[in-house]
Amino acid sequence: MANEIIIVEGKSDSQKLKKIYGENLITFETNGLGIDDKKLNSIKELSKKNKIIIFTDPDGPGKKIRETIIEFLDVDVFNAFVSKQDIDKNSKKIGLAEASEEAIKKALDNLITYNKKNISISWDEYVKNDFYIKANRIIIANHFNLSEDMSSKSLFKWLNWMNLKVKDIEKIIGE
C-alpha cells in the first residue's frame, strides 16, 4: 500500500490495520468527529502526493467524517466500507477495530472512488426511477456497505460522487 494513506477515526483502528498489513502502513487518525480545519488541511496536503483512502466506522459519525473529508478535498477520494454485519457480534462498539480481518481485507480490495465534482444522475432521474423509495435505497446501500438509514438526499449525493448512471443503479436494484 505504498503512497496510500488510510484515514481512520482512532488509534484502535490504526492498530487493527497495522496488525493486518504491518507497521509500515500509514494511517491518519481524525480522532472521531474531532476533525477540524487543521486536520483537513493536513489531509489535503497529503492528498497532493498520496492516494487518500477513507475507512471510517459504519455508523453516523463515520458517515459524517467521510462526507466532511470528501467535500473538503478537490481530488478523487477512495473509500473502503465495512458493514455493521461485519462487526463482532459480542462487541459493544460498531467500529472498524471490531471488524473481522476478512471484512477489512475485502473492503480495501474493493475501493469505491468518490469525486464531489461528479454529476452523473439528475434529481429528476433519481425520482423518476424510484431510487428514492426506501426499499430501493436499502438495496443500493447494502450493495455498497452503506448505512440502510441513509436519507434519500444523502444517497443521491453519494451516487453522484460514485459517478453512477441510471443503468448502473438499475442493475444493482435488479440483482
UniProtKB/Swiss-Prot annotation:
Subcellular location: Cytoplasm
Co-factor requirement: Mg(2+)
Cofactor-binding details, from the entry: Binds two Mg(2+) per subunit.
Source taxon at top rank: Bacteria
Documented EC number(s): 3.1.26.8
GO biological process: rRNA processing
Domain Toprim: 3-83
Gene Ontology CC terms, in alphabetical order: cytoplasm
Similarity section: Belongs to the ribonuclease M5 family.
Name of the featured protein: Ribonuclease M5
Species, as recorded: Mesoplasma florum (strain ATCC 33453 / NBRC 100688 / NCTC 11704 / L1) (Acholeplasma florum)
